[in-house]
Amino acid sequence: MDMETSWRFLRSVCLLSFILGSFSVYQTLCLVDAQEDAIVTLQVDASNVTRRPIPETLFGIFFEEINHAGAGGLWAELVSNRGFEAGGQIIPSNIWPWSIIGDESSIYVVTDRSSCFERNKIALRMEVLCDSNSCPLGGVGVYNPGYWGMNIEEGKKYKVVLYVRSTGDIDVSVSFTSSNGSVTLASENIIALASDLLNWTKKEMLLEANGTDNGARLQFTTTKKGSIWFDQVSAMPMDTYKGHGFRNDLFQMMVDLKPRFIRFPGGCFVEGDWLGNAFRWKETVRAWEERPGHYGDVWKYWTDDGLGHFEFFQLAEDLGASPIWVFNNGISHNDQVETKNVMPFVQEAIDGIEFARGDSNSTWGSVRAAMGHPEPFELKYVAVGNEDCFKSYYRGNYLEFYNAIKKAYPDIKIISNCDASAKPLDHPADYFDYHIYTLARDLFSKSHDFDNTPRNGPKAFVSEYAVNKADAKNGNLLAALGEAAFLLGLEKNSDIVEMVSYAPLFVNTNDRRWIPDAIVFNSSHLYGTPSYWVQHFFTESSGATLLNSTLKGKTSSVEASAISFQTNGKDYIQIKAVNFGEQSVNLKVAVTGLMAKFYGSKKKVLTSASVMDENSFSNPNMIVPQESLLEMTEQEDLMFVLPPHSFSSFDLLTESENVIKMPISDSYKKTSTM
């Protein structure tokens, strides 16, 4: 081959390579463009023919005493084991978390059964062996660190109550101090003669903090020799919600979800591992000093039951939410009461309803009235047990409760533990309870599980749902997206699903019995997990109108819904969509059946750089909804971009004579979030 021929051949090869390479790049670019331009269409029918009202009760909350959600959490009592009963009734008993200040040569501390409270006989006796000349500087005594440290804030006031008696004169310093006692944040002395303390005497004081410490403790110290008894010690911040005892910041986190109901007090907390440790409402009412408290053996900690039957109903009222009371039906995790012997439990349930609904002259209504609430609470729903359907005596016991309650209170709606989503129940019920905990991908796929549930039976109450397996970690974006898709499915099936709540609601970071949870807190700080923020996307859903919608295109990673709602006299169509995939998705929204223009749009997006990202105390707002305003263009269809691994909502302001306007009851007025 000569030189010229060689150059021609080489040029041909280069040209061919360039053409083939260009074609390959072109194909790649076309593929990328195709991916970027791929459109998923949500067809929305806004006409009156297909619209359907969403139940007023659809989204609520479930409060269980787990993870120190109440004791050391929502219930603002700072003292743990305030009556010294946690160590049991055999004396001498363990006084944990109380600790002694001083050594064995200067003080001796022991429990005895000398209390003036018949249901709480344990008291603390403090034998002071030293005097002002021999006691260590600052004196000797006892201290209580509360629940992993008390949050004492400068300028705030705290009410301290205690019962005391003595065989001699006393001079006791009652103080909030730093965790090691070296810094005094607030203090007052109890000075009394022996003649004034021969019998148990109640002492109250208001301490104002001159410093801040979120790991503080309450301590009693003295340098006066003698015997002193203490019992029923309480320390409460004065700024609880309406003075009702609820920690303000945690209460506000619940309020912001606009819950339409609150299910309480459990959960497994209601059952107990053994019936002897189950929650029994009658032991949680009347004055707090008279409540014996109990050991919750499922979640392995003591509760003084300051957050009791009365307080739960007060909480529901303060939230503007319907109470759903779950009571024990004679069944725990490990033992059961046979149906022939269950009537005492039935009577306890009837009495519990009377406590809430009875007039102030009734037996149990008078107890409620004496506690400061003469008017009855609203109670429309009760649940017979928790997750007990497959226990051998459940159905027999359930029928005893059902018949007795319907006879006494025919309007009350009764919730069965048995799942009717796949097959009919074999017993009467107004609602059936449905619980699901699973992987994120699995929960995403279950968004259509209620599509084929029979509509002629009891309604569904999805009272516990969450992604809680390994891929959820402590509460990440991945878990939240799976839950968001599931909730969209429940919203679209709200003709059968009438109530929904996440579980668990709270976790004290010092006692993570169950993870993940919606709200994480310690003594002074808190944050919402992505699962909490997902629920914010549904605050307008209860009582709104569901619009018939259909997704078309490659929708394996997308779920969406459409509703209309009204707030402050303005009408909105809200589009919500989950993108569970790794690529952005273009969402075209085509609305028919509505002669209206969209005058504005508010976009809200929940996403993060990594699907495994979590919020934390150091970065509590890493994953929170980001809101922005969108300008609307003059076009028939709407186009939105769904970022990878995201949950988005679009509130479209409409204006037309034909716009959907749903009446809103006085009890469910909506406030603007614009």
From Swiss-Prot:
Tell me which InterPro entries the record gives. Answer: Alpha-L-AF_C, ASD1_cat, Galactose-bd-like_sf, Glyco_hydro_b, Glycoside_hydrolase_SF, Glycosyl_Hydrolase_51
Reactions the enzyme catalyzes = Hydrolysis of terminal non-reducing alpha-L-arabinofuranoside residues in alpha-L-arabinosides
Query: Where is the protein localized?
Result: Secreted, Extracellular space, Extracellular matrix
**Molecular function as annotated in GO:** alpha-L-arabinofuranosidase activity
Signal peptide residues are 1-24
Which EC number(s) does the record attach to this protein?
Answer: 3.2.1.55, 3.2.1.-
Q: Where expressed (tissues)?
A: High expression in flowers, siliques and stems. Observed in the vasculature of older root tissue, at the tip of anthers and in the petal blade of fully developed flowers, in floral abscission zones and in silique replum tissue. Expressed in the cambium and phloem, but not in the xylem or in the vascular system of floral tissues.
> What's in the keyword line of the UniProt record?
Extracellular matrix, Glycoprotein, Hydrolase, Secreted, Signal
Taxonomically, the superkingdom here is: Eukaryota
Q: What induces it?
A: Not induced by hormones or during leaf senescence.
Query: One GO CC term of this entry?
Result: extracellular region
Q: Name one GO biological process term.
A: L-arabinose metabolic process
Glycan attachment points: 48, 180, 199, 210, 361, 522, 548
**Description of the deletion phenotype:** No visible phenotype, even in asd1 and asd2 double mutant.
Q: What does this protein do?
A: May be involved in the coordinated dissolution of the cell wall matrix during abscission and in the secondary cell wall formation in xylem vessels.
What family does the entry list? Belongs to the glycosyl hydrolase 51 family.
Name it.
Answer: Alpha-L-arabinofuranosidase 2
Which species does this protein come from?
Answer: Arabidopsis thaliana (Mouse-ear cress)
The gene for this chain is ASD2
